[in-house]
Amino acid sequence: ICACLVGSEMCIRDRFISPHFPLYFHNFCSRLKNRGVNVLGIGDAQYSEISNETKESLSEYYRVNSLENYDEVYKAVAYYISKYGRIDFVESQNEYWLETDARIRSDFNICSGTKFEDLAVMKYKSKMKAVYESVGLNVARYCLIDNFENALNFIDAVGYPVVVKPDNGVGATSTYKLNNQAELEYFFATKDERIYIMEEYVNGHVETFDGITDSNKNVLIANSTIMLNSIMDNVNEHCDTAFCNRFVAGSDIEEIGTKVVKAFDTRSRFFHFEFFRLDSDKEGLGKKGDLVGLEVNMRAPGAYMPDMINFSYESDVYTIWADMVIYDKCFIELKQKYLVAYIGRRNDIGYMFDHDQLISQFGGNIMLDVDVPEVLSAAMGNHVYMVRTENQEHLDYLINEFLKRCDGSNWR
């Protein structure tokens, strides 16, 4: 992306990887363009296939045959540099392309974000743990499994169940809970060639600390979500998806999350940190209610969570992000006013209330109502409602009503 500020002597040259996907990512580009920035994108979709919103958010679009082919991406960046000058900012907001972003920064000496040689601690789950520990957080015991005997030795030490996932992976893809040796044997018989990390099972639920930082790692806006069920289970067991946020100011996760922000290279970016909140005492990890370090994601939270923040603050995180990129500050006075829940329903589950009934009964609370692209539906559900209210009791009621089964039973 090349970005030029209209009416200013300052010139920012900025490039956005895959601006067309996920669908709402055009908002990052549009806020820059609305501020007089010339926004240039690189993607592998045909120009005719990208949304009108994305087209209107870009000043120029360079199509490559595949974003997986770095030579093509390199040539695209070189083309933009030859036409517009030096690139100053590179972003995808997509975990899958973080390595591509970082490689471009290294190859073209772009200093506004993490370079490739410094990326490992943000991509490999095994390396993240040491950073969490450096700020005083406990982490689950783990080992990198390269053979069956190594896995058995680890399980002898921690017991079943265990969780396995790619050490360098995206989301909950290829993440499994193994309960016995038969499942372990099946995993080894069917797994791919990637390096997997095996962790002791933690009886807890995931909570996040998300936000935007300036170039000095100061948090400009923050949010925290509480996962009401496991994304791993959503994917593997085809469950509903539900999570909600909290009032973050003064919470323990704000205090700890801010320390984690300082420990990682979070300069000038969106961040999405994950923790376990222990649901029971766990020897070596902590007491019920304690936070345990899990993973970091150096991008905006997914699943329409940026919009959750918008609805909670009655603000616009895309504008805050764009102002951070251009001016390194936030100009908006922020106050979190509402609690918001994300509710993802499945097409093949029978619910008590159909869409029209939900709109009729709860329309005043519904802030977002959208179908989910098939490629994201395993984790997010097929159709999403985002609802908001002013107190936790009413929010819990809304979640339960939206997911209540046709026979009147609760969703969990």
Tell where the protein language model's regions lie, with residue ranges.
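Nucleotide-activated donor-dependent transferases that construct or modify glycoconjugates
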Residues: 13-21, 25
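Short, glycine/polar-rich helix-capping loops at beta-to-alpha or helix-loop-helix junctions
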Residues: 42-60, 65-67, 125
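Glycine-rich phosphate-binding loop signature in dinucleotide/nucleotide-binding domains
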Residues: 80-87, 156-158, 192-193
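A short, GP-enriched loop/loop-strand-helix hinge that lies immediately N-terminal to
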Residues: 82-123, 136-144
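Conserved ATP-binding module of the ATP-grasp superfamily
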Residues: 138-140, 161-164, 173-208, 230-241, ...
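ATP-dependent carboxylate/phosphate-activation module, predominantly the ATP-grasp catalytic core
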Residues: 200-266, 270, 277, 281, ...
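Peripheral (often C-terminal) accessory segments that flank ATP-dependent C-N-forming ligase machineries
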Residues: 322-412
